[in-house]
């Protein structure tokens, strides 16, 4: 066991995989840099951003401004867009050479593909969809995530293996304020690819031309649950949202019923949101839903059941029938906003 302990001491610093698409750094990477900064400060270590892409080095300074001390940049045609094998090879090489203590990855479609590959190749643990990350007294990473269908929060530790790896959904962590004066270093990496393992080639990318709204970006959300009932009920929520320049979102029940699309779902199996104002309309407040919205700045809940758990997190609660309350609220807000 002494060898394990000796081994662990060789690993240090908090690394963040910086996801980029079409040369644009994704918001989840900026959020993870904010969390990495907190973790590294409590360990007295550095934050290292790992940026993979092609002709992408100009993004390094932005990563320093958001909390990175070092940016490792691999600039290669092989990395122009995400393909599993080249990306997995590149990061595996970085980890073997640099020995990070912690690696954080966004739980996006890319991160969910990359994380398990790295975990297998590096023979270390991976905790997916973490909602909390902290450092223990033993300097281990405490990774908290919902377990047993979200009815329990489990804190997981990767005691004997390094790096400690975690994926985190977009919107869960808070980004740091951008500081243009932060100083950091940028290092260009040379990746030795084993191209014989490259089995996949991207021939074409076809983007879905849909007028999709990203509810994680909304300042005000009007969210409907089972109590709203049907499409007609959601049309009333749309009206209410219109008076506040808000977006409409929903609980899982309404997505399962086919009334709302999945990209509007708030909760553990949907999106995590932090708007300034969140209306929970006819939502009882299952723990899975709360996990996706309880960090909202101000929560207004309307529910017929005065014992509904949603009232435990609401700043303002109205016990009443959503179908009656929403039109009254819409009328009142429309009058106020006209003023």
Model-derived segments and spans:
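N-terminal glycine-rich FAD/FM-binding segment characteristic of electron-transfer flavoproteins
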Residues: 1-339
């Amino acid at each position: 066991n002494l060898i394990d302990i000796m081994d662990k001491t060789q690993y240090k610093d908090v690394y963040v995989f910086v996801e980029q698409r079409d040369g644009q750094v994704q918001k989840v990477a900026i959020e993870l840099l904010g969390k990495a900064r907190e973790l590294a400060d409590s360990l007295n270590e550095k934050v290292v951003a790992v940026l993979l892409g092609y002709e992408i080095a100009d993004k390094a300074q932005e990563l320093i401004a958001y909390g990175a001390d070092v940016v490792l940049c691999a600039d290669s045609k092989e990395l122009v867009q995400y393909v599993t094998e080249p990306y997995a090879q590149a990061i595996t090489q970085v980890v073997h050479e640099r020995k990070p203590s912690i690696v954080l990855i966004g739980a996006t479609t890319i991160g969910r593909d990359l994380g398990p590959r790295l975990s297998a190749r590096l023979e270390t643990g991976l905790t997916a969809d973490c909602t909390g990350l902290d450092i223990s007294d033993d300097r281990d990473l405490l990774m908290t995530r919902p377990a047993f269908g979200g009815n329990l929060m489990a804190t997981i530790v990767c005691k004997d293996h390094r790096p400690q790896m975690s994926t985190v959904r977009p919107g869960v962590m808070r980004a740091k304020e951008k500081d243009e004066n932060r100083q950091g270093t940028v290092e260009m990496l040379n990746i030795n690819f084993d191209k014989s393992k490259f089995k996949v080639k991207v021939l074409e990318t076809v983007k879905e031309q849909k007028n999709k709204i990203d509810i994680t970006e909304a300042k005000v959300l009007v969210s409907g649950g089972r109590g709203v009932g049907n499409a007609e009920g959601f049309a009333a929520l749309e009206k209410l949202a219109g008076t506040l320049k808000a977006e409409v979102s929903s609980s899982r029940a309404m997505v399962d019923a086919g009334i709302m699309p999945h990209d509007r779902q708030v909760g553990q199996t949907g999106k995590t949101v932090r708007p300034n104002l969140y209306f929970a309309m006819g939502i009882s407040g299952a723990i899975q839903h709360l996990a996706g919205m309880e960090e909202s700045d101000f929560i207004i809940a309307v529910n017929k059941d005065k014992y509904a758990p949603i009232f435990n997190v609401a700043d303002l609660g109205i016990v009443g029938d959503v179908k009656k309350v929403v039109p009254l609220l819409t009328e009142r807000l429309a009058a106020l906003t006209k003023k």
